[in-house]
Amino acid sequence: MEPLKLGNITLPHKAVFGPMAGFTDAPCRRLMAEHGAGFTVSEMVSSRALVYGDHKTVSLLKAEPNGAPYGVQIFGEVPEIMGQAAAAIEQYRFDFLDINMGCPAPKIVSGGAGSKLMLDPDVCGRIVEQVVQNTSRPVTVKMRKGWDADHITAVECAKACEQAGAVLVAVHARTREQMYTPGIDRSIVRKVKEAVHVPVLGNGDIHTAEDALTMMRETGCDGVMIARAALGAPWLFERVNAAIEGLPAPKEPNLQARMNALRRQVEEMVEQKGEFVAMPQARAQTMHYMKGLKGASALRRYCCELSHLEDIDTLIEAVFDQQRRAADADDNREIPFP
């Protein structure tokens, strides 16, 4: 099996971790890399903020050695400013630069950035050209199927990006109009793969190893990008990698392993950001670890109340207690959190 490459960078695996605002900080990226993510990417950062030297924005670039290539994702709608942003961060430690052409958030598209760029493939190409000219790192692009049902432009945008120097394209198989509603169109990933010569990643609704194999089999894509499904379940990468590489499926982590991962992630968040900043962010992170547990909705409500690091121990104790009580009850009814 040919390895997946970003320019001169060879990835360890073909399943990679996609960027998500508010989630893919350094502790989260480290956890995913340890479980086999082929690369990780920062939260998206504003090109304008980078050019103006905003310290809060620059803090999002923080890199931690984690054994996998690390990319910085930037967003913006003005080619020249995107190029200036690429130049402004040359001094920082990262392996590749990713351009956001897929974010569907209203506050991003209202300014003309994110998936709004896909309405104009020429602008997409000019942005990539400016970034390539101003960085020494390989440049990748994350995009969607298109803007809406009347503007399916992924193929045109991908070709423009490739011509301008992008070395990889990741395609989320929904339009911006669809946001994250159920149902993806894998055929758009196949069409992009057939239209360009650079590696293509398929993205969207990859929750299991079989989902990943289906994406690769039906589209011919070179790898898969997993994002939301890996939150609270970093071991998903181990299962997907094993399936892609034809290896035996790894064992499912037990509850203790899951809670150990949760605690370590939150501890590192507090260590890096301080409790006041980290704990509100940890509420959303910890909710994902409740997936599949008995009484999960009650446990998620408790996650919303986390304020101090020691609250994590109380949460973990509650998780174990909830599962014991559910097992004793021997049914699937939710047991109210005390």
Which role fits each region the language model picked out?
Residues 2-7, 20-95:
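Glycine-rich, positively charged N-terminal anion/phosphate-binding segment
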Residues 20-22, 45-47, 75-77, 102-104, ...:
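Active-site beta-loop-alpha junctions enriched in small/polar residues
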Residues 4-16, 48-69, 103-111, 128-140, ...:
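N-terminal small/glycine-rich loop or linker at the start of catalytic domains
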